[in-house]
């Protein structure tokens, strides 16, 4: 059940300590505005925020779940797993406000519901090698990778899933110079997507992107 008022944020292993790497967070109860595995807001020489894991199960309620977030640096190899849960708005493997998102992963399974967006990686610059898997679950919009400058080699796999809006393997929205290349979407096993499906979508250039279907109901 999504609460009407969100509580405080949860950081790192203990809920209060912001760490750039090595967090392993598992929550099966509680009410949080945002849950972050790794987190960093260092402006000068920011470290990479990498190899953090967040798992949400049970009755844990949260508005935002992010494997890792950095205001200024790269986010790499972070993972979020949602199992049997209903969440408020955003699930992101790794997000950055100024740099690159590389090889971050999201798994949504076991009849979970995400009321808004799911993204493997979100970046102001480049989003590369990020993945999303949705298995017997639902979401509004799904992005394998969402980058400002480029999205390359990202993927989305949906099996017995329901998507109320659109699916993007890779998405890039910089007006002046953006590209989406070699991204993939696979829709299979009776899934339903109500909106559009893009292997790759960019303001400027989209090349070698792929969408595959197998046993899709609608």
Segments and roles (model prediction):
Residues 1-34, 40-64, 70-89, 95-117, ...:
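Surface-exposed loop/turn motifs in large extracellular/passenger domains
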């Amino acid at each position: 059940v999504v609460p009407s008022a969100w509580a405080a944020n949860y950081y790192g292993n203990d809920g209060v300590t912001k760490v750039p790497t090595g967090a392993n967070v598992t929550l099966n109860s509680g009410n949080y505005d945002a849950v972050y595995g790794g987190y960093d807001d260092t402006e000068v020489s920011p470290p990479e925020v990498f190899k953090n894991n967040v798992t949400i199960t049970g009755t844990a309620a949260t508005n935002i779940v992010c494997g890792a977030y950095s205001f200024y640096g790269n986010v790499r190899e972070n993972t979020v797993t949602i199992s049997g849960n209903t969440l408020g708005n955003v699930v992101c493997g790794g997000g950055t406000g100024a740099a690159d998102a590389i090889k971050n992963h999201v798994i949504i399974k076991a009849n979970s519901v995400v009321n808004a967006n799911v993204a493997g990686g979100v970046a102001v610059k480049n989003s590369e090698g990020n993945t999303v898997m949705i298995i017997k679950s639902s979401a509004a919009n799904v992005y394998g990778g969402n980058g400002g400058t480029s999205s390359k080699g990202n993927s989305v796999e949906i099996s017995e899933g329901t998507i109320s809006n659109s699916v993007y393997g890779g998405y890039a929205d910089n007006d002046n110079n953006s590209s989406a290349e070699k991204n993939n979407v696979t829709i299979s096993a009776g899934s339903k997507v109500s909106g559009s499906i893009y292997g790759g979508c960019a303001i400027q250039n989209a090349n070698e992107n792929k969408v595959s279907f197998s046993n899709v109901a609608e």
